[in-house]
Amino acid sequence: MTWKGSGQETVGAEPTLWAISDLHTGHLGNKPVAESLYPSSPDDWLIVAGDVAERTDEIRWSLDLLRRRFAKVIWVPGNHELWTTNRDPMQIFGRARYDYLVNMCDEMGVVTPEHPFPVWTERGGPATIVPMFLLYDYSFLPEGANSKAEGVAIAKERNVVATDEFLLSPEPYPTRDAWCHERVAATRARLEQLDWMQPTVLVNHFPLLRQPCDALFYPEFSLWCGTTKTADWHTRYNAVCSVYGHLHIPRTTWYDGVRFEEVSVGYPREWRRRKPYSWLRQVLPDPQYAPGYLNDFGGHFVITPEMRTQAAQFRERLRQRQSR
C-alpha cells in the first residue's frame, strides 16, 4: 500500500478521504506536523477529529492552514478545544465556547457537527460523513465501580484525574454528563433521519465503544473517554468506518466487522517514541491493509523490543499500585 497523505500532491492521484486528530499545535514540536500535511490530490477531503489546540487563536490558525490545502475539512471538537485557559484571548466557557468555534469554522467554510452532513461520492463512496460532538458521561467505569461517583473516587485514589475537571466548563448545563446526554439525544435524532441503506463514516473525538480504552496504560482514564449510550451506533447506523482520537494510540481495529480508526498524533514525547508510518490516515476508499502492516495491537508503528520491555515493566508497576 502506498501512502501519499503527508507529502505534496501526486500527479494523477485519485481523491481520498483522510483523517487526523490530536494535532495539539500549541505544543512545541507539533506545529511543524500540521505544516507538513498536504493532500495527494486537489479533491482530497480531511477529517480533523478534535484536539487541534487549546487556544482559540491556535485553533483558527490550524484549521485555516488545512482548509487552504484540502478541498473540504470536517472538524469535530475534542475536549481540549473546550478548555478555557487564562492564556486564551477569548474568555468564553462551555456551550458558548463551542458555539464560538462553530461560528469560526462557518466563516472559514469548515464543516462542523452543526452543519448538514456531507456525502463522499468519490472512491469508496457514496458515504455520509457524520461529524459528532458527544462528550462523555463517566459510564466507561473502571473495574470495581458501579457508578460515576465510585469510578471517580477510584480514579482519584490512584491519582488519575482528567484536566477537564478543572478547565472544561459545562455551563449552562449542571454537569459534563448532562451536556453529553443532550448531545447524544440531538445527534441520535439526526442519525435516525438518514437513509439506512447508505453507508456512513461516524466521526467523534471519543471512541463510540468502550473496547478501545482497554489499551490505556491507566484504565481509570476511561471515565473521560465516551459513553455507553453509543455502543451500538456503528452497526445501527450502517458505518463503514468509525473515526476517533483522544486516546493517543494510533491504531486500526474492527468491532462487529466495522473498521475503527484511531487517528491521533499526540504529544511530541509520545510520537517521537513511536512515530506512525503516516500522519494522515486513509478512511476511504478502504485502505485494505497488507498482512503485517499493522502491529500486534493494530497500531500504525513498529513495536521495538525496548518498547515491549518498558510496557511490561509499566504493567507490573500498575498491577502493584492497584493491588495496594
Curated annotation (Swiss-Prot):
Matching CDD domains: MPP_superfamily
Pfam families: Metallophos
Catalytic reaction list: holo-[ACP] + H2O = apo-[ACP] + (R)-4'-phosphopantetheine + H(+)
Alphabetized UniProt keyword annotations: Hydrolase, Iron, Manganese, Metal-binding
Co-factor requirement: Fe(3+); Mn(2+)
EC number: 3.1.4.14
GO MF entries: [acyl-carrier-protein] phosphodiesterase activity; metal ion binding
Lineage: superkingdom: Bacteria
InterPro entries assigned to the protein according to its UniProt record, in alphabetical order: Calcineurin-like_PHP_ApaH (IPR004843), Metallo-depent_PP-like (IPR029052), Pantetheine_PDE (IPR052963)
Family of the protein in this entry: Belongs to the metallophosphoesterase superfamily.
Function as written in the Swiss-Prot or TrEMBL entry: Catalyzes the hydrolysis of the phosphopantetheine group from substrate holo-carrier proteins.
Protein name: [Acyl-carrier-protein] phosphodiesterase PptH
Organism: Mycobacterium tuberculosis (strain ATCC 25618 / H37Rv)
Gene: pptH
